[in-house]
Amino acid sequence: MALRGPAGLGPGSRRPLDEAVAGAEGREAPALVAAGGAPEDDEEDDGRGRGLLRWDSFSAWLHCVCVVGFDLELGQAVEVIYPQHSKLTDREKTNICYLSFPDSNSGCLGDTQFCFRFRQSSGRRVSLHCLLDQFDKDLPVYLKKDPAYFYGYVYFRQVRDKTLKRGYFQKSLVLISKLPYIHFFHTVLKQIAPEYFEKNEPYLEAACNDVDRWPAPVPGKTLHLPIMGVVMKVRIPTCHDKPGTTQIVQLTQQVDTNISVILPTVHEVDIFRCFCPVFLHSQMLWELVLLGEPLVVMAPSPSESSETVLALVNCISPLKYFSDFRPYFTIHDSEFKEYTTRTQAPPSVILGVTNPFFAKTLQHWPHIIRIGDLKPTGEIPKQVKVKKLKNLKTLDSKPGVYTSYKPYLNRDEEIIKQLQKGVQQKRPSEAQSVILRRYFLELTQSFIIPLERYVASLMPLQKSISPWKSPPQLRQFLPEEFMKTLEKTGPQLTSRIKGDWIGLYRHFLKSPNFDGWFKTRRKEMTQKLEALHLEALCEEDLLLWIQKHTEVETVDLVLKLKNKLLQADREHLPVKPDTMEKLRTHIDAIILALPEDLQGILLKTGMT
């Protein structure tokens, strides 16, 4: 692996574009539209935030863009990183190099798109871009950024070229981002990658300059994102959207002849196409993902492996999959030894692999999905069977789900009949995906609602919140107490599926997904208690209070109130703006009631 880069491609450089690139910027192009459940009163934003420095807008969407080529002497090499000031460690560059190319056995001729995910190096500062951090709180939990990971979105081209020593042109254009917007970034690559391979670095620089003019990725706003003559109209979902709804952004009447290509999502994959070979076992796979079981997808190419892994992770939405997952994983990955060791039980992770070597290396894993080539939309492959793990010897083994897992729930025959009928009637894959996604959503909601109801009961009563005492603690989660609630308020109220729901819950309570979910809910509820405590303080007559207390106690109160304000701002507590303003007014009034020497000191201490 090596790093090479043209000196002229620095962050401040403005290289002249050739005529072809200039033409690309000026020509009329289709407008791409993506949506995610937009309410009618959505604001639109096609301007860039004020006061931003060069590359700040770019950094809100992308960490960097890489070009990875093949060098006969060096192997896969990062040829360009843009903007040039972007920081990647040597370990990260090595991972990007190997993950940006299909394994040689994949035989991917032509253009191939896929996605990978890799761990950020431990030696670098782990932080989110300030803009991302600001908007993260409004995202659904499954779209929140994980500061420890990057996503890589790849457009790989391999074509015969007799002028090259190797006989093939092999190159990948890779977008590196914190954002898990799979469908959106794949669409961006479809627009820019083919022309980049013809026009090279000047075209890439122009595309990056366009991205740097984009507005910030604000959830809930309709955003206009121009790139190389194409305008994308997108809406990022918010945590307030109703789960499972995808209302297309309404197009305004346009006087020009732009063609609109509508993308109904920024992050979802074609879930039916991915589950198609195994949809008879989709409910069992849902259980395995829900429970955070070690799962490996063996596929013929990175496209199939990455799409299938992402579909699996997505099938428990709106619940977030809290364990690690790798849409495309290679033997060169820096976590290869960690994830393939036999000295301990396989970790809670979903891996997508294509190298035959993994059939032997991972044969001790308890659950393996072996899939063949995914069929084009509208076709359905032969359904694979559940097979014993001992029958899996090589990656050439027949497609199937290799596991000895016994599902807790009885199989829902209704959804299978519905999907099979759709296949017979040649129902479009998009419609099949809507049916399957709704089925998974209802299944997940039936499972999670009893947990949500019980956890809500752990919240102290509002009347127990005193402004002069610390906020009360949440009651402890007691598994047996929760189990007793299932008799009257269990999933049988909302789901037709029978089976051992109690056993499924007991297993789930020991899983990483429960741990992550409960920590998230506990944090939200603790923040709600802090917000209610602030509101209780605001309702008090603090000037009357200080008349009955000493100067020392009053100064202590001011400092505590200032800390409360800082905490509310830092942790994005769900506090109403007028509550914050009221508290600032209280603080100012208390300070003015103190002697002048103390006023000067307190006004300098922190911000009011």
Curated annotation (Swiss-Prot):
| Biological process (GO), any one | positive regulation of cell-cell adhesion mediated by cadherin
Q: The organism sits in which domain of life?
A: Eukaryota
Q: Which family, according to the similarity comment?
A: Belongs to the DENND6 family.
Q: Which residues carry this modification: Phosphoserine?
A: 127
N6-methyllysine modifications at: 510
* One Gene Ontology term, aspect cellular component: recycling endosome
**This protein's record includes keyword Phosphoprotein:** yes
- Specify where it is mainly localized: other
Q: Domain cDENN, which positions? A: 273-393
- What is the name of this protein? Protein DENND6A
What species is this protein from?
A: Homo sapiens
Write out the function statement from the record. Guanine nucleotide exchange factor (GEF) for RAB14. Component of an endocytic recycling pathway that is required for the control of ADAM10 transport, shedding of N-cadherin/CDH2 by ADAM9 or ADAM10 and regulation of cell-cell junctions. Required for RAB14 recruitment to recycling endosomes.
The annotated region (Disordered) lies at 1-48
Ordered alphabetically, the record's keywords are:
Cytoplasm, Endosome, Guanine-nucleotide releasing factor, Methylation, Phosphoprotein
In terms of Pfam families, this protein maps to: Avl9
Instruction: Please list the residue ranges annotated as the dDENN domain.
Output: 395-528
Domain uDENN: start-end pairs:
63-247
**UniProt KW Nucleus keyword:** no
Give the UniProt subcellular location, in the record's own words: Recycling endosome; Cytoplasm
Molecular function via GO = guanyl-nucleotide exchange factor activity
Q: List the disulfide bonds.
A: none
Q: Which PANTHER family match?
A: LD41638P (PTHR13677), PROTEIN DENND6A (PTHR13677:SF1)
